[in-house]
């Protein structure tokens, strides 16, 4: 398994390409589908067979329709069964997907939205909007922040130190770095609710 990062200038966000030994590939959070991303896929002779969405904000998924035209036999996996006007295979916390023989664990990360999830495979955590290097994901109110922080403490900060965190925004990091950087002693207190 190989992981590639593509930075979309128009959204200032990351899309990830996971290349499998079979020649098939997974795209994660395709905010845009431009020539550079197409070149990355084609250069490695990958065929995109699955798209994983960590959230369903339409403004973050502009590349989705184009990808579906280029790679017609693609399935979309997301927490919600409908993304814009496209059908997705719904996934939920604790589920393990089998994508071309590659196990992908689904981790629920509600907070930014109720439909936010992360995907863990091969020591890489694709966490979407839940976490960025050095900061928690953006939320709309203290209750959402408390929910997000509790989920991060229970589901993400318990992963092995060397787990690589690949966020929607910002550079990669690791669980060890974020555990040292971000205070997690009391999610309710951090959210301003205690």
Q: Which residue stretches match the model-derived regions?
A:
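Conserved beta-strand hairpin/beta-sheet module of binuclear metal-dependent hydrolase folds
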Residues: 1-44, 117-128
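Histidine-centered catalytic micro-motifs
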Residues: 51-61, 107-114, 166-172
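Hydrophobic residues in well-ordered beta-strands that form the structural core
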Residues: 28, 76-78, 127, 167
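Metallo-beta-lactamase
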Residues: 114-194
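Active-site HxH/HxHxD metal-binding segment of metal-dependent hydrolases
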Residues: 12, 25, 32-105, 181-188
């Amino acid at each position: 398994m190989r992981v590639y990062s593509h930075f979309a200038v128009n959204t200032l966000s990351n899309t990830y390409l996971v290349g499998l030994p079979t020649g098939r590939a997974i795209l994660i959070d395709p905010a845009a589908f431009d020539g550079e991303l197409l070149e990355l896929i084609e250069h490695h002779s990958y065929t995109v067979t699955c798209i994983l969405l960590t959230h369903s904000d339409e403004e973050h998924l502009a590349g989705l329709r184009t990808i579906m035209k280029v790679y017609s036999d693609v399935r979309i996996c997301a927490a919600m069964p409908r993304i814009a006007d496209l059908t997705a295979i719904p996934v939920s916390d604790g589920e393990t997907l089998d994508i071309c023989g590659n196990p992908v664990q689904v981790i629920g990360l509600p907070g930014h939205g109720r439909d936010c999830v992360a995907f863990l495979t091969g020591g890489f955590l694709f966490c979407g909007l839940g976490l960025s290097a050095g900061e928690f994901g953006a939320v709309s109110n203290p209750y959402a922040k408390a929910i997000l922080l509790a989920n991060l403490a229970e589901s993400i900060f318990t992963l092995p130190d060397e787990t690589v965190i690949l966020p929607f925004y910002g550079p990669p990091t690791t669980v060890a770095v974020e555990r040292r950087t971000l205070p997690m002693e009391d999610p309710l207190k951090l959210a301003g609710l205690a």
